Amino acid sequence: ETIARKEEKESVDKLRLWLIENNFNKGINIDEDTKRYYPYNNFASHIIGFCGSDNQGLGGIEAKYDKILSGEKGRITRVKDGSGKEIDGTVEQYINATDGNGIITTIDMGVQSIVEKYLEEACIDNKCTDGGNVVVMDPTNGNILAMATYPTYNLNKPYEIVNNEISEKWDALSTKERNEALQAMWRNKAIADTYEPGSTFKLVTTSAALEEGITSPDNSGEFCCSGSITIAGVRIKCWRYYRPHGSQSLRQALMNSCNPIFIGLGQKLGVETYYSYLERFGFLNKTGIDLPGEAKGIFLDKSKVGPVELATISFGQRFEVTPIQMITMVSTIANKGKRMKPRLVKGTINSVTGEIEEFQPECTR
């Protein structure tokens, strides 16, 4: 019977010493095995993922690129008859095991380290009980330079809960509750969680309006904020309704984050056109990033969007998107309208020859 698997060398060495000191040489066998070791412990844990007891990838890059990383086991093949006896004249075939290949990530360790450090500080200082995430992306090629979720977990101890409140009552939890707690800890918020983007989404409304020729950036006095706007009988306030922004250009309206101006632009665009831009920016589908567990945005069906719904969408409310969708949108604008597919792996290294195979960036629009 197997008592324990994948134990740390330090623990096994202590057991060996105890067996020797107590002259205990029967009944207990120690078989050497290998397992994945992560030298940086918590670093980029939600990106890298980890392996199970059978060395199969269970999350992150480990799961997505499991076949490339795993290699193939060696084996011996023999030809036998129906009774299981080897057939005379046949030859055994020995097929050697092959190591898995290495992968080259897009992550910049310096940027990742800085992001993780300040994300942790921000979450602690602001008492973010649900944690947080940060994504840094190169707009020109889709390379993810950093992707951090807080809190992190130790890749060498992936079943060790980091939430003190949960760990204190761990023994009292049901199997279902334990699994849910672990899944929550492993969850990469940057790709799997959705949120309401708010005023940051005004970039989409601005881009669509400019592209359609409805407005221009610096037409002084083109817009006027009176503190609110009425759409289909519903009054929607500007955040600064108590002291309206007054006369503005588009650039100024964006700087002021003036809701009524973007509501008006959304009405001029109309539902069909606005949703076509949601599609072009990639909000109605997953980005296709090379990680498992990606979610997609949550929007009202186009047929159910009336003037009021379109008004709230125009300034970033009543729908949800993922962080990776948002940074893909911003990167598309920065890249002059070319939407690059976000990626975390840019190549592989052949374990035998050392040859590098580079993956080309993919433009999805």
Annotate each language-model stretch with its function:
Residues 73, 127-131, 195, 223:
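Short, small/polar residue-rich loop motifs at catalytic or cofactor-binding pockets
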Residues 115, 134-145:
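Short, glycine-anchored, charge-dense loop/turn motifs used at functional sites
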Residues 3, 88-132:
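Conserved, well-ordered alpha-helix/loop/beta-strand core segments that scaffold catalytic motifs
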Residues 24-29, 124-139:
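Short N-terminal helix-loop-first-beta-strand/juxtamembrane motif that initiates sensory/input modules
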Residues 1-100:
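Small/polar-residue-rich segments within soluble enzyme cores
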Residues 81-92, 140-200, 204-365:
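Beta-lactam-recognizing serine transpeptidase/beta-lactamase-like catalytic domain environment
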